[in-house]
Regions:
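Inter-helical turn/loop segments and adjacent helix faces that build the functional surface
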Residues: 8-26
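Alpha-helical positions within canonical tetratricopeptide repeat
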Residues: 20-24, 28, 76, 129
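Alpha-solenoid helical repeat scaffolds
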Residues: 12-15, 127, 140, 181
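C-terminal substrate/ligand-recognition segments
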Residues: 107-127
Length: 189
């Protein structure tokens, strides 16, 4: 997030016509990005991991392309997605991580992670798989169209905070990504 903050400050400065500030924040951001890429990459796992020097996977690294840290077609990201599929995907649900935490081994999948995987697949050109996983997620909404924070991968029971803004925002943002733009749909031939 340090990199994202500095990168966004550079973009804001550029938009405001402040090239010196933009150059400053870009100069601060780039070494942080390089440290992130080098520190989070685990050669043995062939994946970006939860923390520098860690062997544990965390689905949050699926956000790296969206944040602009790395391109989705980078071989390291492609390999990371494959690792996530092998180790964090449970019956179409994506665990945030598989390592034990303060509460023990995770038993429920964090719903936003499914949308992160859909976005990753979409970015990698796996459009049919992405759409199928997204449509399947819609079946877990309650009668008001709402999602909770977590879901039990074995039963499909919603768990955790309800309704969960993070899950709902993920649904909306992913739906927008998978949709044709209004310009393409209504104003182009």
């Amino acid at each position: 997030m340090c990199w994202a903050g500095c990168h966004r400050l550079a973009a804001i400065a550029e938009r405001l016509g402040l090239p010196d500030r933009a150059a400053h924040w870009n100069a601060v951001a780039e070494p942080v990005r390089q440290a992130l890429i080098q520190g989070a990459w685990n050669e043995k796992r062939q994946a970006f991991t939860a923390a520098f020097g860690s062997d544990d996977l965390d689905a949050s690294v699926l956000l790296l392309p969206d944040l602009g840290v790395i391109e989705a077609d980078d071989a390291r990201f492609v390999s990371t997605v494959k690792a996530m599929e092998r180790e964090l995907l449970r019956e179409k649900h994506v665990m945030r991580y598989a390592a034990a935490d303060d509460f023990g081994l995770p038993a429920t999948a964090f719903l936003i992670c499914r949308f992160w995987l859909v976005d990753a697949w979409w970015s990698l050109g796996r459009r049919d798989e992405a759409r199928e996983l997204f449509v399947d997620a819609l079946a877990y909404r309650n009668r008001y169209g709402l999602l909770s924070e977590d879901i039990d991968p074995q039963t499909g029971t919603l768990w955790g905070n309800f309704p969960q803004t993070y899950s709902m925002a993920g649904l909306i943002l992913t739906a927008m990504r998978l949709s044709r733009s209004w310009e393409d749909r209504y104003w182009r031939g």
